[in-house]
């Protein structure tokens, strides 16, 4: 994770942009090296989970979290990513802040959002029902929605069925 809040632990918060940009550049170089003919590959810039869940954090504001996300996204865009993946999301507000900051920087790049599922079936990690989570996202700015963590394959399958019924995005 290249966000400054995660990097604080290592004394590297000031390197957030550089780390995000360099990671994207390395991935872009690999894509260029291994793409051949019709087998095109893509680079997704990961805006991973922050160490702060905005609904619970009392030490960071939405503006501060947005600035943290924006720095990472700017680095990834400058490094040549093809899409932004807001991933391992536990809170719709965190995801929305990341999506909004991405759109400020680039109106066209595809954005995917991938949430963590709760152990409670049909809910995301913060306990919100999947349908509520989806309604709270800025869906007009999002190209793809999915999940990347679950307690079991069965729970993932049931959640994907709910996602398919509630969302018209791939």
Where are these regions (language model features)?
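Domain-level signal for soluble alpha/beta catalytic cores
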Residues: 1-170
